[in-house]
Amino acid sequence: MSGSRLFFGVSTIVSIIFAILLPMAHAQSAAPAPAPTSDGTTIDQGIAYVLMLVALVLTYLIH
């Protein structure tokens, strides 16, 4: 009886240790977020340049 009790105690302790350590061994660090390729100010500036060019062409054609 003592041998099976000892085996049960050792196997319980080993299984608890594995249950704690194995998930930590497989964990991966989070990858950093990629840098934004374009933000809103770049798009707004592009639209502003196009509108200024249209206004310049219209002013040239009207006069």
Swiss-Prot record:
This is Arabinogalactan protein 41. Its main location: membrane. Belongs to the AG-peptide AGP family. It is a lipid-anchor; GPI-anchor. Proteoglycan that seems to be implicated in diverse developmental roles such as differentiation, cell-cell recognition, embryogenesis and programmed cell death. Glycans are attached at P32, P34, P36. The modification Pyrrolidone carboxylic acid is found at Q28. One of its GO terms (cellular component) is side of membrane. The modification 4-hydroxyproline is found at P32, P34, P36. Transmembrane segments: none annotated. A lipid is attached at S38 (GPI-anchor amidated serine). Residues 1-27 form the signal peptide. It is found in: Cell membrane. Keywords: Cell membrane, Glycoprotein, GPI-anchor, Hydroxylation, Lipoprotein, Membrane, Proteoglycan, Pyrrolidone carboxylic acid, Signal. Contains 4-hydroxyproline; hydroxylated on Pro-32, Pro-34 and Pro-36. The keyword Lipid metabolism does not apply. Residues 39-63 form a propeptide.
